[in-house]
């Protein structure tokens, strides 16, 4: 039996996908996000397009809101609003599970993940670590980062297998590429966004273009929004984002 109402707490990738699936099951759904936008890897102007899409499909989107109480059939927000909720789903991020690594005496890194080298070896050369609990190296600044994505875990698993077998291995750094579908929109992001670059005081500029998903002379082309962020001196690409009904994932 479907619940009569649902509240999703958290507006990241998992939260927005869960909200979509609840709506598809015809369950009235609210999504509560503490920041002023969904999907923090996006810059605000693209995140706004995602918010508009979600609201157009009936999601009660509560941005800039925090939860103060969860009851048997409701969720209370800090502003006093009470949302009906026969089911509450928490999608507020993940943290590395490092208890086993600590028990084994392995070194923990600056991001509170398992510290590894370029070949995913831990501080014990006989132990490798891959996946969400292992720190990665950011391709842009060379610092440790956490990127809980399946594709990256798969690639690092292959690095480990090759290294164990004595093959020549090229280290795999991360740029945090992710693609997600939310209702009729495809959303893609890679590299750093402007918020992060500004916070790190890294010079950058951005351009926006709105191409069609395919050649205009072929029917049913859909417009998309693409954003490219780059270093104004070197021209190095620092990040990119895209939102659209078709073609974004192929860019």
Where are these regions (language model features)?
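Rossmann-like dinucleotide-binding cores of NAD(P)H-dependent redox enzymes
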Residues: 3-8, 13-69, 147-153, 168-195
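FAD-site-proximal beta/loop scaffold in flavoenzymes
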Residues: 1-2, 74-76, 81-162
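Short acidic-glycine loop/turn motifs at beta-strand connectors
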Residues: 71, 79, 231-234
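Mid-to-C-terminal Rossmann-like scaffold of FAD/NAD(P)H-dependent oxidoreductases
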Residues: 133-248
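Glycine/Thr-rich phosphate-binding loops of Rossmann-like dinucleotide-binding domains
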Residues: 17, 85, 98-99, 137, ...
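A short, glycine/Asx- and small/polar-enriched loop/turn
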Residues: 70-73, 123-124, 219-224
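General small-molecule cofactor/ligand-binding pocket signal
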Residues: 60-62, 128, 205-207
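Short, hydrophobic/aromatic-rich segments at coil-to-beta transitions
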Residues: 71-74, 203-205
């Amino acid at each position: 039996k479907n619940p009569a109402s649902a509240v999703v707490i958290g507006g990241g990738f998992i939260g927005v996908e869960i909200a979509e699936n609840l709506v598809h099951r015809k369950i009235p759904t609210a999504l509560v996000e503490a920041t002023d936008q969904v999907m923090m890897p996006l810059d605000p102007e693209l995140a706004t397009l995602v918010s508009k899409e979600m609201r157009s499909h009936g999601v009660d989107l509560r941005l800039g809101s925090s939860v103060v109480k969860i009851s048997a059939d409701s969720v209370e927000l800090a502003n006093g609003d009470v949302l009906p909720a026969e089911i509450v789903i928490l999608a507020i991020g993940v943290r590395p599970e490092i208890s086993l690594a600590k028990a084994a005496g392995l070194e923990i890194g600056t991001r509170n993940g398992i510290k590894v080298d370029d070949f995913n070896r831990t501080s014990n050369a006989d132990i490798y670590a891959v996946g969400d609990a292992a720190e990665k190296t950011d391709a842009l600044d060379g610092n440790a980062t956490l990127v809980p994505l399946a594709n990256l875990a798969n690639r690092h698993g292959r690095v480990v297998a090759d290294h164990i077998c004595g093959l020549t291995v090229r280290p795999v750094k991360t740029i945090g590429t992710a693609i997600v579908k939310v209702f009729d929109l495809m959303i893609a992001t890679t590299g750093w966004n402007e918020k992060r670059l500004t916070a790190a005081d890294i010079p950058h500029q951005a351009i926006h273009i709105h191409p069609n998903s395919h050649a205009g002379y072929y029917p049913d082309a859909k417009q998309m929004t693409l954003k490219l962020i780059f270093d104004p001196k070197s021209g190095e690409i620092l990040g990119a984002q895209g939102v659209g009904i078709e073609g974004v994932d192929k860019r």
